[in-house]
Amino acid sequence: MSLMDPLANALNHISNCERVGKKVVYIKPASKLIGRVLKVMQDNGYIGEFEFIEDGRAGIFKVELIGKINKCGAIKPRFPVKKFGYEKFEKRYLPARDFGILIVSTTQGVMSHEEAKKRGLGGRLLAYVY
């Protein structure tokens, strides 16, 4: 089995486990990008604690689910967005205004679209969570 997009696979796995009602999910393979996306989700209150477990290969993330995710997924292709262009993508990927977050990769790191707006940054869209 080969993974074409580990981030999309991880978010889909989280969404499926949340829908079934599991409390803990193990994500493998782990990567720095997945870790940063999980950190943004944790900072915004969508997941509980997560930890990296070394397994001798790429590693595994153990994520505690708290039942706050309705849907999450990767955005493909990774659209570039300017600092004033978030509203178009909010309408496309989020169900309502001020409900959910878009996760953006900027020059200053991975962050939510709200934080990127405050800092006046553009970037590439990675994922959505609500």
From Swiss-Prot:
Pfam families hit by this protein: Ribosomal_S8
InterPro entries the UniProt entry points to: Ribosomal_uS8 (IPR000630), Ribosomal_uS8_CS (IPR047863), Ribosomal_uS8_sf (IPR035987)
Keywords, comma-separated and alphabetical: Ribonucleoprotein, Ribosomal protein, RNA-binding, rRNA-binding
GO molecular function, one term: rRNA binding
Disulfide bond residue pairs: none
SUPFAM superfamilies reported in the protein's UniProt record: Ribosomal protein S8
Coiled coil start-end: none
Quaternary state and interactors: Part of the 30S ribosomal subunit.
Function: One of the primary rRNA binding proteins, it binds directly to 16S rRNA central domain where it helps coordinate assembly of the platform of the 30S subunit.
Protein name per its UniProtKB record: Small ribosomal subunit protein uS8
Organism: Methanocaldococcus jannaschii (strain ATCC 43067 / DSM 2661 / JAL-1 / JCM 10045 / NBRC 100440) (Methanococcus jannaschii)
